[in-house]
From Swiss-Prot:
Keyword Protein biosynthesis attributed: no
Entry GO terms, CC: cis-Golgi network; COPI-coated vesicle membrane; endoplasmic reticulum; endoplasmic reticulum membrane; Golgi membrane
Topological region Lumenal: 1-4, 53-58, 111-116, 169-178
Listed PROSITE patterns: ER_LUMEN_RECEPTOR_1, ER_LUMEN_RECEPTOR_2
Residue numbers marked as site, Important for recycling of cargo proteins with the sequence motif K-D-E-L from the Golgi to the endoplasmic reticulum: 193
Topology class, membrane: Multi-pass membrane protein
Record keywords, A-Z: Cytoplasmic vesicle, Endoplasmic reticulum, ER-Golgi transport, Golgi apparatus, Membrane, Protein transport, Receptor, Transmembrane, Transmembrane helix, Transport
Annotated site residues (Interaction with the K-D-E-L motif on target proteins) in this chain: 5, 54, 117
MF-aspect GO terms: ER retention sequence binding; KDEL sequence binding
Disulphide bond pairs: none
Organism: Danio rerio (Zebrafish)
Protein name: ER lumen protein-retaining receptor 3
Region annotation Important for recycling of cargo proteins with the sequence motif K-D-E-L from the Golgi to the endoplasmic reticulum: where it falls in the sequence: 204-208
Length: 215
């Protein structure tokens, strides 16, 4: 494992923990897209089905289990424990516009036409767009709390570091995963505008990050 992948995993874990603790400590999920969190839980579920069929390393297994537990715990906080604070009206992105194309593409573009491989491919494609309901919600409300912005920052860093990981592996091993790389590029592009707003507004000390309201 190279430093880029390890750093990416750490950023990913930090992002999920930031979100979980934000909801738990504030006893509120205001400003958080439950739809994005459900999509991320679905990403982990379909990607980590190999937990039951193969073993790579203790690190790999532990990280998969932690991601699954935190993802479903976060979904539980949003839709059950603190459901009264969930803003379903603002969280109005039509997720079927993501799920249907992603499902279709995973059947058409994969490395092997087997159930586990198709589901793995589905998870890669879905992860690249799973953040869209959250970004849509922020745009719709016009602002994001700084802690939510920190969560998105670490998610973006995770994705960018994984792109560096793929470049490093191609340079040192000649290994290239087209599906993962293309999906990672797409996902990183979605974060670019957010990165600009984060560094120009949140780091200046504002408690919230204001965004342009949709017309």
């Amino acid at each position: 494992m190279n430093i880029f992948r390890l750093s990416g995993d750490v950023c990913h874990l930090i992002a999920i923990i930031i979100l979980f603790l934000k909801i738990w400590r504030s006893k509120s999920c205001a400003g958080i897209s439950g739809k994005s969190q459900v999509l991320f839980a679905l990403v982990f579920t379909t990607r980590y089905l190999d937990l039951f069929t193969s073993y790579i390393s203790a690190y790999n297994t532990v990280m998969k289990v932690v991601y699954l537990l935190l993802a479903y715990s976060t979904v539980g906080l949003i839709f059950f424990r603190f459901r009264n604070s969930y803003d379903s009206e603002s969280d109005s992105f039509r997720v079927e516009f993501l799920l249907v194309p992603v499902a279709g593409l995973s059947f058409l573009e994969n490395y092997a036409f087997t159930p586990l491989e198709i589901l793995w491919t589905f998870s890669i494609y879905l992860e690249s767009v799973a953040i869209l309901p959250q970004l849509f919600m922020i745009t719709k409300t016009g602002e994001a709390e700084s802690i939510t912005a920190h969560y998105l920052l670490f998610l973006g860093l995770y994705r960018a570091l994984y792109l560096a990981n793929w470049l490093w592996r191609f340079h040192t091993e000649g290994f290239y995963d087209q599906i993962a790389v293309v999906s990672g590029v797409v996902q990183t592009i979605f974060y670019c505008d957010f990165f600009y707003l984060y560094f120009t507004r949140v780091l200046r000390g504002s408690g919230k990050m204001s965004l342009p309201m949709p017309v």
